[in-house]
């Protein structure tokens, strides 16, 4: 296959596993030092020794007892040397990473602690969450009826859920940023240091060209199964549907295993399916999943056709058409994120009504 984005899959798993850890493993425990909890959560950001660390997804994937995951026991089995801090918009805080990917060099939206970079906010939230899980005091929440109860350890006195904040923030600051503001912005008609067109230049000894690989890495951050158009929205969101599809994955190549690199819905792609399914019976149904996938597939076909010419070349006209597809996919992806934010706002309004 000329398609590969294993590094992106590893990062999808790091984010998903972090959310699972915070929701299901992290508990209020004064006997465990704050710094130990910070280290446990920071692992998912910095990926220290991740190559030999066990993934958690095999525990929480739907119908886990009947699923065999392909080469996914450790993060290194999926892709070696991966982390999130080197891919977050604005860089790693030490001058490295994606320092040029913070649009206009400006980060705003969170006043507490005055974080100057996204990574600063991530570290701040980890510290806050660790302290919250170590203070021995349960957060009490009061619902719209006046009833009170102890909140989950992720929730602070202001009602802020750090698991949700971390997961959704990283999906934007890493996945959406990298997908749309990095890989999809590759100069696909450029040339390498040897003067070879990117559409013709092999990426090392791999079976794909440089241009194809960069595009596929952008798709990897969206997170859909490669045959995502074969799924219904309810299947992609792992809600219901045909037995072989209803859990958000499908053994497409019939090898008896689920390959997270190609046969599973992560992150943004699953959220798009949720928005589409949730709006299907309303007056203004959305189809974000199709609006993202169709132009991505069309753009990838243009690259494939160009790479397989007798003399590989991406013409100006072909690149212009491909850029139109990339634009449409990126805008639909962003609209899906906005719709998800509105969905949660509506949830809050319903809860307090």
What are these regions (language model features)?
Residues 1-353:
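Mature extracytoplasmic or organellar-lumen-exposed domains after removal of signal/transit peptides
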């Amino acid at each position: 296959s000329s398609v590969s984005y294993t590094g992106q899959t590893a990062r999808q798993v790091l984010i998903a596993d972090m959310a699972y850890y915070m929701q299901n493993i992290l508990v209020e425990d004064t006997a465990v030092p704050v710094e130990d909890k910070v280290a446990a959560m920071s692992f998912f950001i910095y990926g220290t020794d991740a190559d030999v660390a066990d993934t958690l997804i095999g525990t929480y994937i739907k119908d886990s007892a009947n699923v065999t995951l392909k080469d996914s026991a450790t993060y290194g089995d999926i892709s070696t040397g991966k982390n999130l801090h080197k891919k977050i918009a604005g860089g790693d805080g030490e001058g490295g990473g994606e320092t040029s990917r913070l649009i206009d060099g400006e980060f705003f939206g969170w006043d507490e602690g005055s974080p100057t970079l996204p990574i600063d906010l991530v570290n701040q939230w980890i510290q806050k969450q660790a302290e919250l899980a170590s203070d021995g005091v349960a957060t009490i929440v009061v619902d719209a009826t006046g009833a009170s109860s102890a909140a989950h350890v992720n929730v602070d006195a202001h009602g802020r859920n750090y698991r949700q904040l971390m997961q959704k923030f990283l999906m934007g600051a890493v996945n959406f940023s990298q997908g749309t503001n990095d890989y999809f912005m590759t100069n696909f008609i450029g040339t390498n240091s040897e003067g070879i067109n990117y559409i013709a230049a092999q990426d090392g000894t791999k079976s794909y060209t440089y241009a194809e690989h960069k595009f596929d890495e952008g798709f990897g951050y969206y997170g859909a199964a490669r045959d995502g158009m074969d799924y219904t929205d309810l299947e992609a969101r792992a809600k219901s549907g045909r037995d072989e599809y209803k859990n958000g994955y499908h053994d497409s190549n019939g090898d008896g295993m689920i390959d997270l690199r190609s046969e599973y819905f992560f992150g943004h792609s699953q959220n798009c399916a949720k928005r589409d399914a949730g709006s299907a019976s309303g007056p203004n149904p959305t189809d974000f999943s199709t609006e993202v996938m169709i132009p991505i597939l069309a753009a990838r076909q243009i690259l494939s056709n160009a790479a397989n010419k007798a003399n590989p070349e991406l013409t100006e006209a072909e690149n212009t058409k491909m850029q139109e597809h990339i634009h449409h996919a990126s805008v639909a992806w962003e609209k899906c994120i906005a719709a998800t934010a509105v969905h949660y706002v509506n949830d809050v309004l319903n809860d307090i009504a």
